[in-house]
């Protein structure tokens, strides 16, 4: 080959190599920046909502992270109302709520939202009576009158009628309730609306009812704290919070007329009563169930997700995490005072998880839920 041709090719090759290096340089830095964001391919999920499920959700997040080190899940325990609000605003990938979203809420959401039941829990009455050792019992009528402000002392005749062999203290009774938007409140007021016509008419049900009386506490944690540090109080919390704080739990008279303690069997029995009546969208209330051994203030906890996920890595990780929660994750329920899903509900929840869809390619696993674009 003539020398000038070799020289021309040499110079051309050098220019091409320089141009190629300049062309790929931004891409190389972009790749490094993306790698730093996702920490070598890490997928980040952001969730928020129910304080009811928080002890179990934190356990799930920890255990799933051990199984899938590339997945980071952050769950903020801000109350079901807050979780639903953030999900509708698309600032989180999933919400969690102790009750199903209302039809109005679903219609106002910017996309189709799926309800995926992941666990069962109990709302309990707990109290602080210094020096009092007996376990108390409450009928539905008595509970309604306490929270309506009609019963103001612990030795009221209605409480005495529910506890005939107990010497009740002659002390003022103080109610503690949630101050934030709360699925726990929604479950409790749903129950009260079923058992008390006066409650249904005067107050009704919801995440933020207009309480007739009482002190407010933020989250299950706040209500538990108020009761623990304030003598002669009574309030409602998720079972795990009462047990963890060594607070007494009352027996509640159920629809069949039996006084029932919340536990694995009685909460599961409440769910079993409602399986056949559960609609296709899985939004169901299981309070005041009819079974003789059913605890009357029980509820599913739902994880709420958009059916259409814009980022495939987020969509796939959501499906993997939720599938694990309703299967292997159920073994962590009982030690934390929750009840596992009935087998039939596991099957139906799996069907909902399978409906989550996402594109085949694209995304980096750090999607901004609000915009649908990658960070």
Predicted feature descriptions by range:
Residues 2-4, 20-21, 32-35:
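N-terminal targeting and processing segments of secreted/endomembrane and organelle-targeted proteins
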Residues 18-28:
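Bacterial N-terminal signal peptides
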Residues 32-375:
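Flexible loop/hinge segments at secondary-structure junctions
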Residues 4-19:
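Bacterial N-terminal signal peptides that target proteins for export
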């Amino acid at each position: 080959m003539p020398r000038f041709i070799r020289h021309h090719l040499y110079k051309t090759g050098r220019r091409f190599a320089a141009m190629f290096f300049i062309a790929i340089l931004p891409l190389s830095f972009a790749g490094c920046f993306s790698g730093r964001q996702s920490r070598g391919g890490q997928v980040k999920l952001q969730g928020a909502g129910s304080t009811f499920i928080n002890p179990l959700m934190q356990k799930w997040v920890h255990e799933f992270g051990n199984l899938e080190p590339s997945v980071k899940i952050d769950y903020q325990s801000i109350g079901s109302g807050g979780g639903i609000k953030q999900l509708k605003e698309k600032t989180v990938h999933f919400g969690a709520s102790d009750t199903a979203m209302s039809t109005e809420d679903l219609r106002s959401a910017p996309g189709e939202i799926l309800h995926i039941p992941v666990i069962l829990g109990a709302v309990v009455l707990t109290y602080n009576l210094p020096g009092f050792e007996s376990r108390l019992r409450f009928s539905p009528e008595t509970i309604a009158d306490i929270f309506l402000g009609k019963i103001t002392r612990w030795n009221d005749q209605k409480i005495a009628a529910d506890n005939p062999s107990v010497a009740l203290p002659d002390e003022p009774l103080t109610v503690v309730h949630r101050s934030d938007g709360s699925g726990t409140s929604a479950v409790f007021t749903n129950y009260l609306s079923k058992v008390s016509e006066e409650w249904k008419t005067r107050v009704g049900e919801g995440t933020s009812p207009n309480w007739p009386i009482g002190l407010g506490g933020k989250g299950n944690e706040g209500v538990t704290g108020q009761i623990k540090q304030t003598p002669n109080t009574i309030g409602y919390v998720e079972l795990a919070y009462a047990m963890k704080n060594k607070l007494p739990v009352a027996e509640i008279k159920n629809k069949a007329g039996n006084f029932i303690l919340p536990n694995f069997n009685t909460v599961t029995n409440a769910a079993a009563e409602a399986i056949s009546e559960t609609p296709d969208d899985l939004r169901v209330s299981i309070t005041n169930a009819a079974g003789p051994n059913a605890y009357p203030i029980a509820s599913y906890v739902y994880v709420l997700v958009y059916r259409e996920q814009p980022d495939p890595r987020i969509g796939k990780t959501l499906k993997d995490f939720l599938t694990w929660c309703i299967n292997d994750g159920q073994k962590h329920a009982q030690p934390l005072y929750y009840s596992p899903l009935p087998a039939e509900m596991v099957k139906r929840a799996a069907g909902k998880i399978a409906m989550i869809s996402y594109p085949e390619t694209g995304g980096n696993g750090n999607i901004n839920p609000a915009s649908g674009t990658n960070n």
